[in-house]
Amino acid sequence: MSRKYDTCRNMKPLRGQERAIKSPVMRYLNIVALGAVVGLAAGQPAEASSSAWYNSEGGKVRLVTSGKPDEAGKIHGVLDIALKPGWKTYWRDPGDAGVPPQIDISASTNIADAKLSFPPPQRHDDGYGKWAGYDRPVSLPVTFTLSAPDQPATIDANVFLGICETICIPVQTRLSLDPASDPNNATDAALVKTALATLPGPARSDFGIRVLPGDHETLIVEAHSPGDAESVDFFIAGERDYMFGAPVRSEKDGKLVFTVPILDRPSATPTDGGLYYTLTSAEGAVDGLLPFP
């Protein structure tokens, strides 16, 4: 494929998401540009606890919720991405190429925050680049936090994601719903419950990582996992102006080590929070935060 256009470098992120999709998800993408597909899901006034489907070239997308908020003032839902065969979408940090899913809820009523969570990704090399994500339909859990838990809420979300085959289509659409309008929908609740069950568990001593001494340009971690070490993979999300290359695995003295090039980093190392990682194996997956290198 010729490198005619670099659509991802020219796409505008959702408002408030500029940091989230800085260079880590916009590099090296060889695609034929169809342009961003922008629109509203058909027939989707905020009258249902789930939105209508929005149809695109490579699949369709909708928001589904389990209805009313829980005691903590949170509404649980999923960004439901139904991919056509041969199409793919991306993890929170796609790798060499791609656009991660994003959601902007600034137009919503009584919604303070929306947090996307990600099932364990797979690593792929399709001949155009190495990427982390999903090559089959996937439901990404979303947790909506209410500003005032005792007040009604409506969700009016701008969703932005990449759906790719041999071409990449940036999809941006508005999905609206009223979580309280159908709070006892068993089908929606089951979909949300199933999606939550796919998430990685918390890292633990026998299934997780230990950060080893590295340098300004290299992150090194030792991975611990039950079962076959050959199946283990390590994914790290470049955020806060960090950008990482593909991890290189090595085994020595019975220890599994991943060495990750740091391609870009902030001028000052952040002191709050950390970087998301996921460790996968044939036995399952765990995730956590590691200190900023």
Model-derived features: positions:
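Short, linear, compositionally biased motifs with a strong N-terminal bias
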Residues: 18-20, 38
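Bacterial N-terminal signal peptides
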Residues: 30-41
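Positively charged n-region of N-terminal signal peptides that target proteins for export
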Residues: 2-3, 12, 23-29
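Extracellular/lumen-exposed scaffold segments
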Residues: 47-293
